[in-house]
């Protein structure tokens, strides 16, 4: 399909990202998916999905409810292992190593591939203890190291200036948007390589959403980010690459501007112009 697509009012203005030189073929690959299928019991949820997630870019997964985008996201740190009857066929390579190989240290994998969920889930602890939680699990207890990690992670999550004078107050006293940025700080404190964001703004107001979107843009200089979103405006704003999924299959994957303005598949065009989904 060669003609330009009407984008149904989608604002394509990115958050200041440099879009000139995006080329999926030239990117360094962080996560390689060479043909992945997933089953819940007898029900197949993913069908032979193949894609390469580029390093230190933001990749968005879009598609209607139930299309498999969150299921695919959760395969990247094996969260689906926690679902009874879940079975994966194929491989996922994180920097060349199959994370589904026998003997894989799943706890270490989840440190390397951190995840933030839809609803902010701070622990009922102080702001400080939320941030250092993962470090303490690793046996790190030196105050100087923890203090430095708290400041680094909270600055990285654009929250330091708002909470630096109340680090020992309960995290539950923060606003929803602050709680979500705290959860991001807690996730990056253990210095993962990949950040998975499963609709991180769906429970937030517009101002908090904008702060998280700006944060995502800042974080990609250090982390590979994959975000699932129902909000196509958000995908257009924050991502470098977008994957459109439908009924468990990957329909189209490419740079975000091209996918939204000149999609290769009619199914993609129908979705982004609001004909279904």
From Swiss-Prot:
Keyword Repressor listed: no
Native organism taxonomy: Bacteria, Pseudomonadati, Pseudomonadota, Gammaproteobacteria, Pseudomonadales
Membrane topology: Peripheral membrane protein
GO biological process, one term: phosphate ion transmembrane transport
Keywords noted in UniProt: ATP-binding, Cell inner membrane, Cell membrane, Membrane, Nucleotide-binding, Phosphate transport, Translocase, Transport
Compartment(s) where it occurs, according to its Swiss-Prot or TrEMBL record: Cell inner membrane
Reactions catalysed, as given in the entry: phosphate(out) + ATP + H2O = ADP + 2 phosphate(in) + H(+)
Positions of ATP binding: 63-70
Enzyme Commission (EC) number: 7.3.2.1
Start and end residues of each ABC transporter domain: 31-272
Family: Belongs to the ABC transporter superfamily. Phosphate importer (TC 3.A.1.7) family.
CDD domains documented for this protein: ABC_PstB_phosphate_transporter
The organism of origin for this protein: Pseudomonas fluorescens (strain Pf0-1)
Role, per record: Part of the ABC transporter complex PstSACB involved in phosphate import. Responsible for energy coupling to the transport system.
Superkingdom to which the source organism belongs: Bacteria
Listed GO CC annotations: plasma membrane
Subunit structure, as described in the record: The complex is composed of two ATP-binding proteins (PstB), two transmembrane proteins (PstC and PstA) and a solute-binding protein (PstS).
InterPro entries: AAA+_ATPase, ABC_transporter-like_ATP-bd, ABC_transporter-like_CS, P-loop_NTPase, PstB-like
GO molecular function: ATP binding; ATP hydrolysis activity; ATPase-coupled phosphate ion transmembrane transporter activity
UniProt cross-references to SUPFAM superfamilies, sorted A to Z: P-loop containing nucleoside triphosphate hydrolases
Protein name per the record: Phosphate import ATP-binding protein PstB
């Amino acid at each position: 399909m060669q003609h330009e697509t009407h984008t149904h009012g989608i604002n394509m203005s990115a958050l200041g990202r440099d879009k000139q030189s995006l080329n999926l073929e030239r990117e360094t690959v962080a996560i390689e998916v060479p043909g992945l299928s997933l089953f819940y019991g007898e029900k197949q949820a993913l069908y032979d999905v193949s894609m390469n997630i580029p390093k230190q870019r933001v990749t968005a997964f879009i598609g209607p409810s139930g299309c498999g985008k969150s299921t695919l996201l959760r395969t990247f740190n094996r969260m689906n292992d926690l679902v009874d009857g879940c079975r994966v066929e194929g491989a996922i390579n994180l920097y060349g190593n199959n994370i589904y190989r026998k003997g894989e240290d799943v706890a270490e994998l989840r440190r390397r591939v951190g995840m933030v969920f839809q609803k902010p889930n701070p622990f009922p602890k102080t702001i400080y203890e939320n941030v250092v939680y993962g470090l303490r699990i690793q046996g790190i207890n030196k105050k100087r190291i923890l203090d430095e990690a708290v400041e680094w992670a909270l600055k990285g999550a654009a929250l330091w200036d708002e909470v630096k004078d109340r680090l020992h107050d309960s995290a539950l006293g923060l606003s929803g948007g602050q709680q979500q940025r705290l959860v991001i700080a807690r996730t990056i404190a253990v210095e993962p390589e990949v950040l998975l964001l499963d609709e991180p703004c769906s429970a937030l107001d517009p101002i908090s959403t904008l702060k998280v979107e700006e944060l995502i843009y800042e974080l990609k200089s250090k982390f590979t980010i994959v975000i699932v979103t129902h909000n196509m405006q958000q995908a257009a704003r924050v991502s470098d690459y977008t994957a459109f999924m439908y009924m468990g299959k990957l329909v189209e994957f490419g740079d975000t501007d091209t996918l939204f303005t000149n999609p290769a598949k009619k199914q993609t065009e129908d979705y982004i112009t609001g004909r279904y989904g």
